[in-house]
Amino acid sequence: MPLLFRGIRGTLRASVRKRIHMSPAAESTAYPHLFTPLDLGFTQLRNRVLMGSMHTGLEDRARDFPRLAAYFAERAAGGVGLIVTGGFAPNVVGWLKPFGGKLSWPWEVRPHRQVTRAVHDNGSKICLQLLHAGRYAYHPLSVAPSKLKAPINPFTPRALSARGVERHIADYARSARLAREAGYDGVEVMGSEGYLINEFIAPRTNQRTDRWGGDAAQRMQFAVEIVRRIREACGTDFIIIYRLSLVDLVPDGSNWTEIVQQAQAIEAAGATLINAGIGWHEARIPTIATSVPRGAFAAVTAKLKPHVRVPVIATNRINMPDVAERILAAGGADMVSLARPLLADPQWANKSRAGRPEAINTCIACNQACLDHVFENKTASCLVNPRAVHETELVYRPTSAARRIAVVGAGPAGLACATVAAERGHAVTLFDAGSEIGGQFNVAKRITGKEEFHETLRYFRHKLGETGVEVKLDTVADVAALAGFDAVVIATGITPRRVDFPGADHPKVVTYLDVLLGRVQVGEQVAIIGAGGIGFDVGEFLVHEGPSSALDPARWMAEWGVNPTFEGRGALAKPAPEAPARKVWLLQRSPGKPGARLGKTTGWIHRATLKAKGVTMLGGVTYLGVDDAGLRIRVDGQVQLLPVSHVVVCAGQEPRRDLHAALQAAGINAQLIGGADVAAELDAKRAIDQGSRVAAAL
């Protein structure tokens, strides 16, 4: 080890020599390890909850910083120990996109002070993430260690010169120094997920022959020098988190020996904490989607922990306090990182500390309003919490004039509307003809890999009681029942659309609700008409049987090809998908790739899952008819007979508005929300957002 590293390490370890064992003074809580303070020597974190970095779309313009400050302030007030911002580039070529978030000049400091002040005023600490996009930069100025285009980006990067590498190291140090001036307690250096620093480290993307390439020791020098220069620039009383890729999940990634060597070199260079990074963005293995088991990658953090002396942070799919406590109590990490769970519920930490997990609005890892929005250049939000990143715009103010409100339909839109209206002080009655709340949530929870919807239903059951909503199940609301209310909101949902071709009324033809709700037992060969989100869900439901691999990390890793020991380059193994429960054809009338309109960050996962299960996916299909022999179709001019036992129709839906029409005829105004308003696709994101906004305006 170089003497310079030893000197820095000795200085820091003398102060940090981490007191990360259970403190006798830890407050009494159901999760004692989670709420033990973490002593870093020069500062102390109030608990072990890290709000992990997530881009929101508010980082890119100074005019949005008041909103960014409000967003972080709400999480700080919610009890988080340490917050990490979304990524800010250390220079222009490191932008994620043109004119993206950047901190490289003194005049860019002032807006950040709103953010740091808001967080500190609410008792938390905050680090700015330094993220250079490298070859993932979505602009023509991109640079990388070598001129190698990423498979997920149309731009080919320019290879940095040796002088350019030195300038970049200086840029990182300057940005960190500016972050300190802005009031940040530290920085997180993004060294994972396939961004610039990770590109230097992995042989996959570093083909250099100078001192910044070659063997593992030379490939990691870029990262080590960045940490060392930041420590020199910012002093010993400044947090440096290093986001270290513990599993790349791509061919020619780092192996375990190299990862340990890198962690130790980063520690010696001056890092305060090491945060686990899991997978590159171009990896074909999901790492954060809802089908990934909770805490699936915590074991790799536990594997690293004995090799370093600085605290290590476990991450990915840790969405409930029992998962976090289990990881910490087992000694597998010193902190846990949560990003999306704190979008879903800014009070996550406070509720956990109070022993109220039932009150947590749990992240379901859908990505629909957070990551998908960011990749579509929209401001992020959250499917289950539309106030996320919109705290200054969507405000649930106490009403000055309480009214009697009727909400008809206890699906996503109705539940959101009823609970927000009651929270504001209205007297709310929620009607539903069914025997349980949930509507389409009760369908979604049955899909393999979507078990998290059980948590959403648990949350709304709790919220209904907490806010005092009167719930009337097994009740068909009619005009007479609704006549005495001050306002009526209709959230009666949808009716599946029928198809029109010969044999559409054949007993083989069933709706997706028939299948998912168990009204029909389908045979061993099934055709699905419609390859939208519902069609893919039905496909996954039909090819799986028995307990879901989303509940079993070992089975899930075997299916996707993750080496359970995390050895080997990229921690890859040969995928071993389990045999499908039945043969399925997934069909769509429109030409092109089935599932093309699925979520930007999750669609590929659904397609890969069905492909691995042998599902035949066809576009440009003409349906000729159904008879006792099966389904006849025409594709590319060729007629085929699919010898199926059932044809499941997932061809859209129509709004259910019978009650609304009756109320209008009786002269009673009522507002439509959710599927009763727009039924193009079953869209819980839009339904909850609309229901919440309508309630906020009542």
Regions found by a protein language model. Name each.
Residues 5, 12-408, 412, 417-428, ...:
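Flavin-dependent oxidoreductase catalytic cores
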Residues 287-293, 395-397, 402, 443-455, ...:
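Short, contiguous acidic/charged loop-to-helix segments that flank catalytic cores in large enzymes
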Residues 308, 331-332, 467, 505, ...:
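Short, structured coil segments at secondary-structure junctions
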Residues 403-433, 437, 472-480, 484, ...:
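Rossmann-like dinucleotide/flavin-binding elements
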Residues 439-485, 595-621:
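N-terminal Rossmann-like dinucleotide/flavin-binding domain of flavoprotein oxidoreductases
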